[in-house]
């Protein structure tokens, strides 16, 4: 059960990261504030 939960959590966080990259990272102000976008710092 723990293994399945860990896999689900990983998939969820991965999907969330992709959503943030795809949506937030389309907007320069959001890119600047979000390290997931690879913002220049």
From Swiss-Prot:
Q: What is the effect of changing residue 30 to S?
A: In [C3S; C9S]Pu1.2; complete loss of HVA calcium currents inhibition in rat DRG neurons
Pfam families, per database record: Toxin_8
Please give the GO cellular component terms listed in this UniProt entry. Answer: extracellular region; host cell postsynaptic membrane
Where does the UniProt entry say this protein principally localizes? secreted
Q: Which residues carry this modification: Cysteine amide?
A: 37
Q: Which organism is it from?
A: Conus pulicarius
Post-translational modification note: Non-native isomers 'ribbon' (with disulfide connectivity C1-C4, C2-C3) and 'beads' (with disulfide connectivity C1-C2, C3-C4) also inhibit high voltage-activated (HVA) calcium channel currents in rat DRG neurons (25-30% inhibition at 1 uM toxin).
Gene Ontology MF terms: acetylcholine receptor inhibitor activity; ion channel regulator activity; toxin activity
Top-level taxon:
Eukaryota
Share the domain note from the entry.
Answer: The cysteine framework is I (CC-C-C). Alpha4/6 pattern.
Statement: the UniProt record of this protein carries the keyword Disulfide bond = yes
Task: Tell me the disulfide pairings in this chain.
Answer: 24-30, 25-37
Tissue expression remark: Expressed by the venom duct.
Q: What family classification does the UniProt entry report for this protein?
A: Belongs to the conotoxin A superfamily.
Keywords in UniProt for this one?
Answer: Acetylcholine receptor inhibiting toxin, Amidation, Disulfide bond, G-protein coupled receptor impairing toxin, Ion channel impairing toxin, Neurotoxin, Postsynaptic neurotoxin, Secreted, Toxin
Name of the protein described by the UniProt record = Alpha-conotoxin-like Pu1.2
Q: Mutating residue 25 to S: effect?
A: In [C4S]Pu1.2(1-9); no loss of HVA calcium currents inhibition in rat DRG neurons (this effect could be blocked by the selective GABA(B) receptor antagonist CGP55845) and no inhibition of human alpha-7/CHRNA7 and alpha-9-alpha-10/CHRNA9-CHRNA10 AChR
- List other remarks: Negative results: does not inhibit human alpha-7/CHRNA7 and alpha-9-alpha-10/CHRNA9-CHRNA10 acetylcholine receptors (when tested at 3 uM).
